[in-house]
Structures are given as C-alpha cells and as structure tokens.
C-alpha cells in the first residue's frame, strides 16, 4: 500500500488545486481552490477557454460578478470529478468587511445552485479575520457552510469554534516558513521536522483542543511544504494537498501510522477558553507570526485577485 492510500484510512484527502485535470488520478474526496490557484490555472492553455467563455457569455456584467462566475465554473468542473465538496473563496479584498463577505458568499451559492449544485457540496472560504469569522457565523446560521482560511493561531481556531463554522484550514507550511526565516542561520532542519515542525505542532494543538471539548468544526491542515508535514498529521480530519505532494505520497511505500488521535486527546488536561473581539485582537497581536502571515496572506490573495481582474478585462 502506498502512503496516499494509507493516509486515506485515517484522514479525508483533499486536492489543493484549480488544475482539475490533475485531480482524478489521486481520487480525493474534496478539493480546495483559492485566487492564486485559479490564476495559475487560467494561464494554462487547457483552462483559458473557461475564462474567455465566461466573459463572452456575461460580457457587460460587473467585474466582481464575472470573477465569481469564473470561480463557480472551476468549482463545477471539479465537482464533476470528486464525490465531496469544493471550497471556493470570497474575494480577499473583503476580508475586513462582514456585510460584503456575506453578500458575496450568498451570490456564490446562488450561482452554484443555478448550475444544479447542492449547497452542501460547497464550502465558502473566508479569511479568519474577526470580520471574516463573524461573516461565517452568519452564513452558517443561513445553512451556508464555511471554510475559514489563512488560519495561523490558536485564538483564530477558538474563535472559529465559537462561531460554529464548518471547517478551518490551519496553514502548516506558512507557519514553518516564518519560523525558519526568523531563525535564520540557527535553523536546524532535522530538529524542526515531523512532530517537531512548528506548523505541525500548531495543528496538533488545535486538534487536541477541538477533540477534548467535542467541537464539531472540522480541521483541514493546509499549505504543506513537504511530505513529512503531511505524514506527521495523519489522523487529522482532513488534509488538503497539492498534486505534487499527492504524487510523492502515491510513489512512497513506507509504512504510515496514525499521528493524531481524537480518543487520546480526550484524556488531556486542557482548559477551555473563549474570546470576545478585544481578547481575540489582543491574542492575535501578541502572536507575531500569525499577525504577519495573516496580513501577508491577505495581501497576496488580493494581488492575485487583481491580476485575475485584469485577465477578465482583457478577455
């Protein structure tokens, strides 16, 4: 048995790509997209027609609507391949606007429903800012399920649990990147690998807390830099993995054991916490890594959204 098949025994495997022609080979349950992945995909000849067809069909419509229609086109293609859910992201430029995020999410769902897609097959991705979490709480009450992304800290995870969101996406690789860069020449890779990886440790802390207190929100580890980070999180609810790393797992025959165990977490001595807005903002500010990576992640998604805008305008 290869490691990908072994991982599927413990964890729901999700494909992290907009390149849906790569997905089928790995038979994931779900798939995730984001503005950067869609931008990367539409620049490939195989997918250019999705962009030009969308613009041709809806020429004259507002640019933000064209963007949403393009995202839904990709999502529908992906859903024709996978049995589960696709995650589609609200424009990151709305990350600090609760009202606008809710409105865009509702439009995305309406567009999916117009294509015959049931609401339960879509997760709306929203950045895990205070405003994004508030938007997700409203959406969940309306029966629209959410995936809180750009999650780097324990306080974000707790606030998401309080909001009863469907799923969170803690970013393993970007946490690793920050600590590696911060350490500079003092970084020793083997001392920070596997279970000692700071990104892995962050997800483990969240996993243990959620399972200890019976929190229903799903945890989907994301943003992996190497296979070791993935195998160290075997047993996490879901892991979203790039095609490149899916291929490496598929090619590896080494044994793979469960690393995270919900039953074991229930016996841990942990204290329940909660955050109001002031407490959340203070805790996030105290975490330099999370503060910097959240801001950086939003900026990067905004840059790619603007590039997608330009491609739509030029089509």
Swiss-Prot record:
Record-level GO BP terms: carbohydrate metabolic process; pentose-phosphate shunt
Coiled-coil residue spans: none
Active site (catalytic residues): 125
Gene3D superfamilies the record matches: Aldolase class I (3.20.20.70)
Pfam families according to UniProt: TAL_FSA
Domain of life: Bacteria
Cytoplasm among keywords: yes
Keywords: Cytoplasm, Pentose shunt, Schiff base, Transferase
Keyword Glycosyltransferase among UniProt keywords: no
One GO molecular-function entry: transaldolase activity
Pathway this chain belongs to: Carbohydrate degradation; pentose phosphate pathway; D-glyceraldehyde 3-phosphate and beta-D-fructose 6-phosphate from D-ribose 5-phosphate and D-xylulose 5-phosphate (non-oxidative stage): step 2/3
Cellular component annotations (GO), alphabetically ordered: cytoplasm
EC number: 2.2.1.2
Catalyzed chemical reaction(s): D-sedoheptulose 7-phosphate + D-glyceraldehyde 3-phosphate = D-erythrose 4-phosphate + beta-D-fructose 6-phosphate
Protein role: Transaldolase is important for the balance of metabolites in the pentose-phosphate pathway.
UniProt-listed PANTHER family: TRANSALDOLASE
Record-stated family: Belongs to the transaldolase family. Type 1 subfamily.
Protein name as it appears in the record: Transaldolase
Organism: Albidiferax ferrireducens (strain ATCC BAA-621 / DSM 15236 / T118) (Rhodoferax ferrireducens)
Phylogenetic lineage: Bacteria, Pseudomonadati, Pseudomonadota, Betaproteobacteria, Burkholderiales
Gene: tal
């Amino acid at each position: 048995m290869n490691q990908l098949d072994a991982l599927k025994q413990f964890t729901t495997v999700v494909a992290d790509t907009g390149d849906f022609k790569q997905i089928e080979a790995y038979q994931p349950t779900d798939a995730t997209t984001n503005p950067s992945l869609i931008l990367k995909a539409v620049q490939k000849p195989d997918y250019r027609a999705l962009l030009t067809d969308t613009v041709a069909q809806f020429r004259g419509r507002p640019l933000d609507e064209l963007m949403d229609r393009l995202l839904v086109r990709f999502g529908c293609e992906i859903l024709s391949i996978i049995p589960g859910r696709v995650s589609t992201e609200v424009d990151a430029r709305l990350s600090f606007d609760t009202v606008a995020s809710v409105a865009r999410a509702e439009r995305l769902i309406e567009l999916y429903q117009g294509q015959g897609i049931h609401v339960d097959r879509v997760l709306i991705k929203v950045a895990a800012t205070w405003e994004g979490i508030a938007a997700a709480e409203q959406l969940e009450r309306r029966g629209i399920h959410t995936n809180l992304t750009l999650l780097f800290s324990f306080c974000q995870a707790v606030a998401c649990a309080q909001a009863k969101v469907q799923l969170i996406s803690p970013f393993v690789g970007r946490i690793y990147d920050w600590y590696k860069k911060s350490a500079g020449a003092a970084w020793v890779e083997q001392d920070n690998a596997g279970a000692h990886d700071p990104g892995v440790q962050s997800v483990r802390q969240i996993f243990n807390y959620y399972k200890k207190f019976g929190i229903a929100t799903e945890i989907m580890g994301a943003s992996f830099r190497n296979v070791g980070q993935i195998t160290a999180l075997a047993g996490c609810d879901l892991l979203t993995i790039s095609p490149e790393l899916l291929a490496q797992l598929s090619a590896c025959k080494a044994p793979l054991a469960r690393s995270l165990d919900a039953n074991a977490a229930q016996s841990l001595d942990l204290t329940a916490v909660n955050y109001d807005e002031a407490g959340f903002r203070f805790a996030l500010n105290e975490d330099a890594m999370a503060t910097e990576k959240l801001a950086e992640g939003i900026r990067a998604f905004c840059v790619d959204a603007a590039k997608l805008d330009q491609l739509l305008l030029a089509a």
